[in-house]
């Protein structure tokens, strides 16, 4: 079975040929793990948060934390509706392949903009989606405790 993300990434690279991509785990490039993974992602400028299958409202793998936590610009399909939590100054939302390509090209040429989006996204993510806040929410929901905390996703 062919993973639709492979086709998407191959097409993205074709139409965005002036930008360097580091893509692992496809096209005979071995995946990277552990320390090598974290060292590699720390040296990237942007991260594509691309999930398997169709985009689902509010769904993301933990990849989003790795991207944003390293201060990278997070590129995410607008169908995830993460715009409900983040502005375009904190995350980059794309409509389709060509829109994503255009946004990657723009950000790759504007270092100041890239750093600003990465930093703002990281600050907001760490404030509202950090592990303590998420764990507290799970505990309160599980035990039926009335929350005194503000959860961005409960608005």
Short names for language-model regions:
Residues 18-19, 47, 91-92, 113-114, ...:
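A general structural signal for well-ordered secondary-structure junctions
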Residues 1-88, 145:
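Nucleotide-sugar donor-binding catalytic core of glycosyltransferases
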Residues 102-155:
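C-terminal amphipathic helix plus adjacent low-complexity
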Residues 53, 79, 96-97, 130-131:
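An acidic- and aromatic-residue-enriched active-site/binding cleft used to recognize and process polar
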